[in-house]
Regions:
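Polysaccharide-binding and catalytic clefts of secreted carbohydrate-active enzymes
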Residues: 1-130, 139-144
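Substrate-binding cleft of secreted/luminal carbohydrate-active enzymes
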Residues: 138-147, 168-231
């Protein structure tokens, strides 16, 4: 069914490519900001939230490995079961990519932030997908993270993506959007995708994004198409070396200092 749909889309005159979204399992682990909405805590994998235990999946896994993952004490710790689940999603992505490429068109996708996170949360091992362009959804606010989350994700994505895939960074528009774009472009992203289009509808927002894009193009033109900041892109593992984290700590201290002591 999916293959025939993609073939039909690829035959549309003037279409340059196909971008897939939601090629994944239902969230095994939700972003932290959504836990209160559903009244749950997902500090680890819980079987009741993993919808990968479909009878057909179980039978296919048993045929390959000779045992039922459900019979284990904690199936979430079974590397074979995790990789098997990821491979089912990868198979669909690459089937679509094969069709798209057979028509000479570009293949793109919008997965979760990094292959490692995406594999754990929704079984998207997207570093193995045959993509021309990837737009990982690096919405730091969804994970109650600061701007450093974007930098770290980009460094990880550059390392783990398919070498043939061009990396963009998907960002949700917020007050700190310019800092977010800086973090993405300075740590490996070759471009930015913005969610949602409604954030681009005011003259002021369009002017801001245009000015930012023009400035990035100018910097790259002066440096043979390369962003000079990339040469110093390293993931910060010491929290006391991260200005974003230190600023949040200072803000929290100030907040607590204003709380009256009972």
């Amino acid at each position: 069914f999916s293959k025939k749909k993609i073939e039909a889309y690829c035959e549309v005159e003037g279409l340059n490519g196909i971008a897939i979204d939601y090629n994944r399992f239902v969230d095994v682990i939700l972003p932290t900001t959504l836990w209160p909405k559903y009244g749950i805590v997902q500090d680890q994998e819980y079987r009741q939230w993993d919808f990968g235990y479909h009878p057909a999946m179980i039978e296919k896994f048993k045929a390959a490995y000779g045992y039922d993952p459900k019979e284990q004490e904690d199936p979430s710790q079974d590397g074979k079961w995790l990789q098997f689940s990821c491979d089912q999603i990868t198979e669909v992505a690459n089937m679509i990519a094969d069709v798209v490429h057979s028509y000479g068109k570009k293949m793109a996708a919008s997965p979760f932030p990094t292959p490692k996170m995406a594999s754990k949360m929704v079984r998207q091992d997207w570093g193995k997908w045959n993509l021309d362009i990837v737009f990982p959804m690096v919405y730091h606010n969804f994970y109650t993270e600061d701007i450093s989350f974007i930098s770290d994700c980009m460094i990880e994505d550059v390392r783990d993506k398919n070498p043939k895939t061009t990396l963009y960074c998907g960002l949700m528009v917020a007050d700190d959007i310019e800092n977010a774009m800086d973090a993405a472009l300075n740590h490996g992203a070759e471009g930015i995708s913005i969610f949602t289009v409604s954030a681009l509808r005011t003259p002021e927002s369009r002017a801001m994004f245009k000015a930012y894009a023009d400035s990035v193009r100018a910097v790259r033109a002066e440096n043979n198409g390369v962003n000079p900041a990339l040469s110093k892109s390293t993931k910060v593992t010491n929290p006391f070396e991260s200005m974003d984290i230190l600023n949040r700590i200072n803000a929290k201290i100030k907040e607590l200092a204003n709380v009256p002591i009972p």
